[in-house]
Structure formats: C-alpha cells, structure tokens
UniProtKB/Swiss-Prot annotation:
The organism's taxonomic lineage, starting at the top: Bacteria, Pseudomonadati, Pseudomonadota, Gammaproteobacteria, Enterobacterales
Binding site residues for Zn(2+) 2: D112, E145, H355
Protein's gene: argE
Subcellular location: Cytoplasm
Protein name as catalogued: Acetylornithine deacetylase
Record GO terms (molecular function): acetylornithine deacetylase activity; zinc ion binding
Length: 383
C-alpha cells in the first residue's frame, strides 16, 4: 500500500475543493490546470508516467494521460475533470466543501464526476502494478460539459490503441453500451421592421418562423417513422423546440425571430445526414425568403455512440457484472473515445444527481466501485 497518498476521503475532499467549472460564458469558465496538477502528483507518486496535454482553442484547459507499462492493448480508465456551474441560490451547502450526511457525500462533482479519480487512485494504491503484463492508462479530460474539446483533441491526436476504455460517468455501476447524439441549432429569421399599421411595408419574421416550424414538425414526424432502435426506451430520434424569441413591441413589425432546437440522433445516423435533413426541411422557406434564413450550431454537435452487443468488451463486462449493457438518451465522451478503442460507460453514482443542486454520491457505491475497478484492472491488464 502507498502510504504517502492521502486517504480516500482526503483525495475526494481535495478534488471537490479544487474548482474546475466549464461554461460557454467566459465569466464562469475556469481552467482545470490546478486539478490536473493535483492528479498528476498523486499518479506520479503511484509510479505512473504522467503527461499533461494543453487542449488547443480552450481557455487554458488540459488533458492528463498517465500510464503504467508498455506494449500493445491494455485498459484505459477515463473521466472528465470539469463540472457544470452551480446555482448558489439552490445549493444549501458549500459546493466546494465535501460533506458527509446520511450516507451521502455532497459536493459539486461528487457524482459527475471528479470523484471517480479518488476511486481510481485509492484502488491503485493496493494494486501491485509491477505484476501487470498489459499497460494501464488513466485519461482525465477537459470541457466535457461544454464542447467536449478534451476528448475530441485526445481522439484526434493520440496513437494509442488500448484493448478497451471504460468511462466512469455515473451509471449506478450499470454498463452503458450506446447513447444518442446531440445537435443544438439556432434557426434565425431576419425580416424587415416597420410600423404595424402598414404590414405591407415590412417583412414579419415571426410569420416566417411560424411557417418554418410547420416544416420542422413534419421533419420530426419523418424522423420518428424512418429511424428506429429498440435498444432505447425512446426508440427514435427526438426533436425539441426549446426556446423562441422575436420582436420587441406589439405595434412594430418583427424584424428578427430566433428559434433554438435540440435533436437527439440515434447511433448510426451521421451528423452530416442530420444536417442535410434539417436543411432540406427548411429549403422551401429559404427559397421563398432568400437570404432571410440562417442555421447555426449553438454547440459543437455530438454523434451517437454504440459499442455492438457482440463486441468482446461488452461480453466481458456483462459476464463480470452479471448485467446486460443498456442504452441511454444522455451524451458522454464515448463517441470520441470509441474512435480510439472499444468503449463502455460504467461508473459510480446516479445520473439523476448530475447537474443538480446539492449533488451527492451515495456511500453505498464505495466498496462496489473499488471492487469493480480492481476486477477491471486484473481482467484487462493481467491476461
């Protein structure tokens, strides 16, 4: 046992006490460098080789890659180091102070998902790493909660090809082998303002948007009829019209109207295909009102993800846990890390706690998670 390292709870406390919020708003966004440096020190103390990787086009964000052992294959344990911002008015405790009450560990990132690294490091202190005959990798990424820039950059730049990767997102220790993607778009209509007493002298953007929404709802129905995957509780792609704003006064012809929509494609649907379907749906509007319709990404799109049920990784994890791998509707970094090697999502904590005030992880997960991590390392690195 490595006695130089802090205790499990002390590791957890230090992680939660180190803010690493990612946000599109620059006023809220924070570098994760302090957290990455903290992890680097602990992993180095365990004897792993550590590399800090600056992530391009971010606000001073870093990935960390640590490894023990050389050669082909092996296991990668992955997680993100950032959290969402917090609503101070809805939290009843300090989000950056780990507190324990009623068998729960409270704090921002306890479940989603900085706490994972406390589990990994605490498990590694009891592993005889010199007995591993395949490499073990620990990947800590940046900006999962916004652009997924860390995972995108790692997948695009690494030459590593482990046998498999486990992303420790909070899944209540149930294996996840597939999830939908995410496309978030802004539809903007530019009209021509004027006095409401003479409608013919203007172009009402709200009226054009009304017609555009009709075409979007037709597309939504088409997606439901054309695509189907029974692995999902909601087995078709979804579209949500989530936000709309237009105009500034009742007596003024609306000059601009903007709609924000969310689409969740199934695995196997390419983002290019989905964009093409969206553009085709709005082609009649664009043709009738030349130059007045624009479509923009609100966030970088995320493709769907699936690790086939017959994949050796899925078979091994299902046998290890005695549970079938499932499909979910939320997104993770899996589609990007799947480009590197077969990937599953499996970790402690409940997804119901993600992005919630007074976020917590039940202490019931502590022993099973340590056991699972030990089993994973022995299975994939000592074969």
């Amino acid at each position: 046992m490595n006695t130089q390292l802090p205790s499990f709870i002390a590791l957890y406390r230090a992680l939660i006490a180190t803010p690493s919020i990612s946000a599109n708003d620059g006023a809220l966004d924070q570098s994760n460098e302090r957290l990455i440096t903290l992890l680097a020190g602990w992993l180095s103390d365990l004897g792993l080789r550590v590399e800090m990787q600056p992530v391009p086009n971010t606000r001073n964000k870093f990935n960390l890659l640590a490894n023990y052992g050389e050669g082909a294959g092996g296991l990668m344990l992955a997680g993100h180091t950032d959290t969402v911002p917090f609503d101070e008015g809805r939290w009843t405790r300090d989000p950056f102070t780990l507190s324990e009450q009623d068998n729960r560990l409270y704090g921002l990132g306890t479940a989603d998902m900085k706490g994972l690294f406390a589990f990994i490091i605490d498990t590694l202190r009891d592993i005889e790493l010199h007995k591993l005959n395949k490499p073990l990798y620990i990947l800590a990424t940046a900006d999962e909660e916004t652009s997924m820039a860390g995972a995108r950059y790692f997948a695009a730049s690494t030459a590593l090809r482990p046998d498999c990767c486990i992303i420790g997102e909070p899944t209540s220790l149930k294996p996840i082998r597939a999830h939908k993607g995410h496309l978030s778009e802004a539809i903007r209509i530019t009209g021509q303002s004027g006095h409401s007493s003479d409608p013919a002298r203007g172009v009402n953007a709200i009226e054009i948007m009304h017609n555009a929404i009709g075409h979007l709802l037709t597309l939504r129905n088409t997606l439901q009829q054309r695509y189907h995957n029974p692995a999902f509780n909601i087995p078709y792609p979804t579209m949500n019209l989530g936000h709309i704003h237009g105009g500034d006064a009742a007596n003024r012809i609306c000059a601009c109207c903007e709609l924000h929509l969310d689409m969740r494609p199934l695995p196997g649907m390419t983002l290019n295909d989905l964009n093409e379907l969206l553009n085709q749906a709005l082609t009649p509007i664009a043709a009738q009102w030349s130059g007045r319709l624009r479509i923009e990404h609100l966030h970088p799109p995320i493709p769907g993800y699936e690790c086939p049920r017959h994949a050796p990784l899925v078979q091994a994890i299902e046998q290890l846990l005695g549970e079938r791998a499932e499909a979910v509707n939320y997104c993770t970094e899996a589609p990007f890390l799947q480009e590197v090697c077969p990937t599953l999502v499996l970790g402690p904590g409940s997804i119901e706690q993600a992005h919630q005030p007074d976020e917590y992880l039940s202490t019931d997960f502590i022993v099973p998670t340590r056991t699972l991590l030990t089993q994973l390392i022995h299975h994939f690195c000592q074969r």
